[in-house]
Amino acid sequence: MREFLVIGLAAGIILILWKSRLNYLLLPSLPVSAGKDPLDLTVIIPARNEAHQIARAVQSFPGLPVIVVDDASSDETAHAARAAGAQVISPPPLSPGQKGKPTACAEGARYATTKWLLFVDADTWFDSPFAASIVAYAEGAGVPFVTAFLEQRCQSLAEKALLPYAFALYFTGVSARAVNNPTSHQALANGQCILFERAVYESIGGHAAVEESVIEDVALARHAKQKGVPVRVMRAEHLGHVRMYDGFAAIWRGFQKNSFRFLVINPWSGLQVILASILLTSWLPVLILGLADYPKPSGAMLLAPTPVAILFLAPLLSLLPWYRGWRVILAPSAIYGFQLIALNGMFTTLTRRATLWKGRRV
């Protein structure tokens, strides 16, 4: 009986992680294009306490108008952005319920006059063909809302361990076909990189329509689809890069703020993520249970052609594409470490506790 449990769990883990990777790879890859010159595009960067990295984001777009919306920073963000060549503006004070990022994005859009608006985060940077490529794709495909996932750059051990697993888990609940299907209710966007045709953006209310949402990117995509606006979710790891968090404390706060809210805003996706998480966290207990069937278990057994060996290797081999090499040995710690982070996020959301994020309670 235990052997069937071990084999069944191994098969389930392989299947769910294979599905996750396939969901990601089925997102279309952004083609590299020279595009038109000059581009009818304004780049908008909401920024709060980003003095250490805002210049890199601004300088990714030479020759293009860049608006940095300085969201009441307490550091030298505004000075660094101006020095890098950006126009710097400030949003109005937040009203009760408003969130900083969507309000900043909405204010930046008010100052833009171009056909296209490109919203990017301050912790992103892009290769020179990116802007032309994403505009050329949007115009060629006739899609007014294009969002792209970027290459995740990880430096600390916590980032290298936790973030690849977090994305693998995230995509267990994402259907690439559904998010890019105008008739599907499933919506997805990556707020690190959103291109929007300004006339369409304004016609549906833009970020102001989701100004009370902490996960404004998914809320904006859902709002757009409800208004009949087609959304295209893509991959652009070859042209865009991001370092989301700079260590464990930032990861903890970031997912405390976002993780459970994503599950709530996309219930079907959330259910799949929860089931995948339960399956994966069953790995170690069932592995120990399987080893109990052997009178003298040893490490060598985990590499022999046995059911427990298959279970032992199932998450490691299945997560290998997300970790890209030796870092996959960190995956077991991520399976259980991220579970604690997710449970903390759920507790924080359900009890309506605030998260301190960049000096502001959200």
Predicted regions: what they are:
Residues 273, 277-352:
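Membrane-embedded multi-pass helical conduit in multi-pass membrane proteins
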Residues 138, 145-170, 199-202, 207-269, ...:
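Catalytic donor/gating beta->alpha subdomain of glycosyltransferases that bind UDP-sugars
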Residues 70-79, 93:
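A conserved acidic beta->alpha catalytic loop
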Residues 1-37, 163-164, 176:
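N-terminal membrane-anchoring/stem segments of glycan-assembly enzymes
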Residues 76, 122-137:
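Acidic donor-binding/catalytic loop of UDP-sugar-dependent glycosyltransferases
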Residues 117:
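Short aromatic/hydrophobic "clamp" motif used to bind/position activated sugar donors
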Residues 21-31, 50-63:
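Short, well-formed alpha-helical segments that are part of the catalytic scaffolds
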Residues 52-56, 75-84:
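Acidic helix N-cap motif at the loop->helix transition within catalytic regions
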